[in-house]
């Protein structure tokens, strides 16, 4: 049984099939090389390397650390696996004993540990499928309230399922536009996490099809959407509260320029 294999000394993995050949969009290469200079070659090599597989275990369920896993340096419950398992056949996966998540997304833990020291009301604004929400549920101090929102209804069902499997009762799942939340819940949240929809440059290695969806126009659209989301939700943040802004992309329009906007 894979549940046994993952968390015991004998680990059985699928063959390595996650090395890809990357064909990057020309405009992306031109823009990113201008931004990174000589370091672009390192990025290009990294995007064609094996896709690391990482999981975050659920401390509430007493899940042991995988004996074949290397720890993620910035996440106490995060581990890299040597190769990818067929998680859909693992009952522990369906029971919420662990969550499959890219290690970079687990860096949220450092922000929470640095700035959240007492119970808070926290909003995960763009929460589906639930990686950051399940992480927040494990990290926030006892007595906190977590509200996980997903504006796309079909994705909100997936979010609700993952939250239920994770097993924290102090989490509410909602399906609202940021503007609705900002108007209805003024100054309610101590912490708002905004992992905003983006052009997905950070997804190139994981999903080769995403390169075909990338364009300069989409970068501009996503940058504008990110600012709209921040504008609409700002009223829900308490004065002096914490806003965590993140994307899975590299360009300055969606990252640094939107930070300047904030």
Residue ranges and their predicted role:
Residues 1-262:
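S-adenosylmethionine
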């Amino acid at each position: 049984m894979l549940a046994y294999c993952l968390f015991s000394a004998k680990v059985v993995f699928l063959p390595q099939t996650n090395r890809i050949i990357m064909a990057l969009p020309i405009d992306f290469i031109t823009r990113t090389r201008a931004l990174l200079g000589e370091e672009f070659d390192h990025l290009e090599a990294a995007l064609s390397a094996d896709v690391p597989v990482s999981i975050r275990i659920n401390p509430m369920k007493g899940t042991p650390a995988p004996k074949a896993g290397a720890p993620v340096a910035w996440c106490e419950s995060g581990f890299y696996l040597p190769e990818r398992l067929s998680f859909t056949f693992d009952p522990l996966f369906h029971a919420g004993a662990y969550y499959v998540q890219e290690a970079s997304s687990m860096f949220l833990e450092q922000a929470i540990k640095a700035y959240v020291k007492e119970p808070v009301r926290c909003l995960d604004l763009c929460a589906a499928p639930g990686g950051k929400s399940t992480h927040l549920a494990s990290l926030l101090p006892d007595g906190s309230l977590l509200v996980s929102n997903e504006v796309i209804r079909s994705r909100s069902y997936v979010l609700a399922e993952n939250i239920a499997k994770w097993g924290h009762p102090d989490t509410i799942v909602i399906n609202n536009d940021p503007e609705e939340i900002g108007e209805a819940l003024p100054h309610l949240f101590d912490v708002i996490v905004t992992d905003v929809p983006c052009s997905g440059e950070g997804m190139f290695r994981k999903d080769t099809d995403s390169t075909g969806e990338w364009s300069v126009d989409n970068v501009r659209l996503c940058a504008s959407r990110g600012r709209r989301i921040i504008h609409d939700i700002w009223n829900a943040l308490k004065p002096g509260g914490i806003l965590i802004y993140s994307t899975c992309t590299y360009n300055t329009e969606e990252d640094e320029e939107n930070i300047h906007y904030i």
